Amino acid sequence: LQISYNVLQQEPTQIIAAARAIDMGIIIKEPLAQVAFEKPRPEGEAQRWELAQKRLAPGVIGDLTRVEASLRWLLGDTDVHTAIVGTTNIQHLQDNIDSVGRGPLPNDTTQAIAAAS
């Protein structure tokens, strides 16, 4: 199953769990929410942007970057098998690899993200 799922779009959780219950593999697209949290406040997606400002605020994720927090949040979901993370910047790729190498977020950070909704 290929589905959009990320720190800002968590609604597919039940779909992912149902797919795993029948042994389907899970591929995540848009794991970084199209980096909506790094862009200026858009007119059309203001609600999503505002959610990003809450869930990925420095007081929630500490000194992690928003990209690192987003990738490591996704790693905490054991139902996910892989994610498609596109980039044209080799440094961004290396940063993503380094972030994933640090493993899932600590439980307190994951809980703080959930509470910031």
Language-model region placement:
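Beta/alpha (TIM)-barrel catalytic core signal, keyed to glycine-rich beta->alpha loops juxtaposed to Asp/Glu
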Residues: 1-117
